Swiss-Prot record:
Signal sequence range: 1-22
Record-linked Pfam families: DUF2554 (PF10829)
Top-level taxon in the UniProt lineage: Bacteria
Keywords for this protein: Signal
Name of the protein this chain belongs to: Uncharacterized protein YncJ
Species per Swiss-Prot/TrEMBL record: Escherichia coli (strain K12)
Source taxonomy: Bacteria, Pseudomonadati, Pseudomonadota, Gammaproteobacteria, Enterobacterales
Length: 76
């Protein structure tokens, strides 16, 4: 009897611990108004990520080009 009661109490605590922790600071939940809004947000994020990657690739190529033109420091 005691083990069944203890099991029920532990199960109840486990089920509701997520709701209790969600109220504490440090847990941030963003409510999405609808699926359309979420998909547009993700598409915008993907577009920004692609632009940033292209820009980084251009800067990387320019850096390597400049580096290839410099004479080696050890040569005399």
């Amino acid at each position: 009897m005691f083990t069944k009661a203890l099991s029920v109490v532990l199960l109840t605590c486990a089920l509701f611990s997520g709701q209790l922790m969600a109220g504490h600071k440090g847990h941030e939940f963003v409510w999405v108004k609808n699926v359309d809004h979420q998909l547009r947000h993700e598409a915008d994020s993907d577009e920004l990520r692609a632009v940033a990657e292209e820009s980084a690739e251009g800067l990387r190529e320019h850096f390597y080009w400049q580096k290839s033109r410099k004479p080696e420091a050890g040569q005399r």
